[in-house]
């Protein structure tokens, strides 16, 4: 039996809604879970496309739930790396998103583009 079954990133952001809409609108992800806070705005949500799942949680709700993690929540220390079948389609889908690194060929044999999603996290798309 495998020790690990799945790895799902939880992106800690100021606002959940823009992040989930990025994946839903541009890539056809489905919203699988939503948790509103007292003001009705989402404090947590997850999206999924086939076997790929991404979770978002607000920085404020993490700090409320785990006050000791306040110092760990500044900045962004994760980049998502997504292997894709068609980089041309991805480039069209991310049009208008802030580009971190334009489309380029890498020394390890892939062609990639890196953008920022609305929460400020870097997402790289690679075609091997």
Model segments located where?
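Short, glycine-anchored, charge-dense loop/turn motifs used at functional sites
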Residues: 117-123
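Vicinal oxygen chelate
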Residues: 1-10, 30-82, 89-116, 127-128
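Major-groove DNA-recognition helix of helix-turn-helix-type DNA-binding domains
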Residues: 27
